[in-house]
């Protein structure tokens, strides 16, 4: 990365946005694959160690032109990729090198934006993924409506090229990008767009995430601009990206463009309280609006997707619910607004009266039904939640059996420690503990009761019960009230956003 930075810094005055020459640098592909390209992929190039090989990349592009547009059969896809039998290998090599190149200006822009006097200016645009947790802790006192929004995807690939043009001015670079998209779409001409994106995300996930981040940033930049114009609340950080790729200058461009294009639209969204948070493709919009204004926001999103991104989205993709009567699902938690009624006696001079105060709190709960279904699927319990022995693990050693159950139990505990009520979490732990004991008893061909009498059961179960307590006992005394309060309260582990996996049973 330092070599690329030096390359761009030396040419910043004349070629700041020109990345096309980097496509023909062999070390780009060596960095992508973790080894020298000509030693491992093209046998005929053994011993060729030139650092700037124009021949290799030109040969790749030429072979892409010469390939048939027919879809590769299943038998061909199983052949060795590095011997030329799979036609898609050429486009895949170039695309993986392309994403390394295209990320360079954004990385440099991020580092240069934090230098000198501009640090305050750009610091305001930083959006942390950890803002999801303050949303979970928010009491939502002034909010009464919630909208579940699922951002539609995929969009037309040409739209992504146009979005990327705001950032770079290299015409040759975009011609190559269009050619790659055109080749890939024609090669998969018999596949639906949804299936195409699914295949693309598996073949080159890094490139897919970059394009998806670019699309989501464009979508949220427009929304956040309108939100700032129509809301009096301080904007907290809500723009979230998988790889935490931040883009900044687009906001300044939107201020000039959208202020002109949406001058009449803003009058329809005079909403002083809007709360917005997103993770992956799902976002939550919470507001104090009336149903009429919430429907206006709903159709604003639909028109934005259809007119600006050419994505057809049905109105049913956005669901509007009243917070006090509906629970919604976000980040594998069930969220609902809990109302706590308090009666306060007040006295003024000789008159006294009672006041009812309603306090709101966003309640985060463990989705017990979904988790039990997951345990049933993995055969840890039956549909009623009764623990079962894991027969396929009966041939393992005692240490491996206990370690596997501990790992699964730790995953649940780590992910759902932010729940406001731990009863359901303790139930899941109980199922796993008893399933572990039944598995060990089955291995030793004994009943559970006889096995517990013969084995030191307290030492076995101690691993499960003291997991969280041991962590906090290193900070607070074991008899401290602070430890007890933390153990019962909500604890958020920040890394659950990066290791997010709904199937926690198989996630280790």
UniProtKB/Swiss-Prot annotation:
Location of the protein in the cell: Plastid, Chloroplast
CC per GO annotation: chloroplast
Gene Ontology process terms (BP): mRNA processing; RNA splicing; tRNA processing
Predominant place of localization: plastid
InterPro entries referenced in this protein's UniProt entry, alphabetically: Domain_X, Maturase_MatK, Maturase_MatK_N
Highest taxon of source: Eukaryota
Single Gene Ontology MF annotation: RNA binding
Keywords from the named record: Chloroplast, mRNA processing, Plastid, RNA-binding, tRNA processing
Family label: Belongs to the intron maturase 2 family. MatK subfamily.
Task performed by this protein: Usually encoded in the trnK tRNA gene intron. Probably assists in splicing its own and other chloroplast group II introns.
Protein name: Maturase K
Gene from which the chain derives: matK
């Amino acid at each position: 990365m330092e070599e690329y930075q030096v390359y761009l810094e030396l040419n910043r005055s004349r070629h700041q946005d020109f990345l096309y020459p980097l496509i023909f640098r062999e070390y780009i592909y060596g960095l992508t694959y973790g080894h020298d390209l000509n030693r491992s992929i093209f046998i005929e190039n053994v011993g060729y160690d030139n650092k700037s090989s124009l021949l290799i990349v030109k040969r790749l592009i030429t072979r892409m032109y010469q390939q048939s547009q027919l879809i590769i059969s299943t038998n061909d896809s199983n052949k060795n990729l590095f011997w030329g039998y799979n036609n898609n290998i050429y486009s895949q090599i170039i695309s993986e090198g392309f994403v390394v190149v295209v990320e360079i200006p954004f990385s440099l822009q991020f580092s240069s934006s934090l230098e000198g006097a501009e640090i305050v200016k750009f610091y305001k645009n930083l959006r942390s993924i950890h803002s999801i947790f303050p949303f979970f802790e928010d009491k939502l006192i002034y909010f009464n409506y919630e909208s579940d929004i699922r951002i539609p995807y995929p969009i037309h690939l040409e739209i992504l090229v146009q979005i990327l043009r705001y950032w770079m001015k290299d015409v040759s670079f975009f011609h190559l990008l269009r050619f790659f998209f055109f080749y890939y779409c024609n090669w998969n001409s018999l596949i639906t767009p949804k299936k195409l994106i699914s295949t693309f995300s598996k073949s080159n996930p890094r490139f897919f995430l970059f394009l998806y981040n670019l699309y989501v940033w464009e979508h949220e930049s427009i929304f956040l601009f309108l939100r700032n114009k129509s809301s009096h609340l301080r904007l907290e950080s809500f723009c979230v990206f998988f790889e935490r790729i931040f883009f900044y200058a687009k906001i300044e461009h939107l201020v000039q463009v959208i202020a002109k294009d949406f001058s009449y639209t803003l009058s329809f969204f005079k909403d002083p309280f809007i709360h917005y948070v997103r993770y992956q493709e799902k976002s939550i919009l919470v507001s104090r609006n009336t149903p009429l204004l919430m429907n206006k926001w709903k159709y604003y999103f639909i028109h934005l997707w259809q007119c600006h991104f050419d994505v057809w989205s049905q109105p049913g993709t956005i669901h509007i619910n009243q917070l006090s009567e509906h629970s919604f699902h976000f980040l594998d938690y069930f969220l609902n607004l809990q109302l706590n009624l308090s009666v306060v006696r007040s006295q003024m001079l000789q008159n006294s009266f009672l006041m009812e105060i309603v306090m709101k709190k966003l309640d985060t709960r463990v989705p017990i039904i979904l988790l039990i279904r997951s345990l049933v699927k993995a055969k840890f319990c039956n549909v009623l939640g009764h623990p079962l022995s894991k027969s396929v693990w009966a041939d393992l050693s005692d240490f491996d059996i206990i370690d596997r159950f501990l790992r699964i139990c730790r995953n649940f505990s780590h992910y759902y420690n932010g729940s406001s009520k731990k009863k359901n979490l303790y139930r899941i732990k109980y199922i796993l503990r008893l399933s572990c004991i039944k598995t060990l008893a089955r291995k030793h061909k004994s009943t559970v009761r006889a096995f517990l009498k013969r084995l030191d059961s307290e030492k076995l179960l101690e691993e499960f019960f003291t997991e969280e307590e041991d962590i906090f006992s290193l900070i607070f005394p074991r008899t401290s009230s602070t430890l007890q309060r933390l153990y019962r309260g909500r604890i958020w582990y920040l890394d659950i956003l990066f290791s997010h996996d709904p199937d926690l049973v198989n996630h280790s």
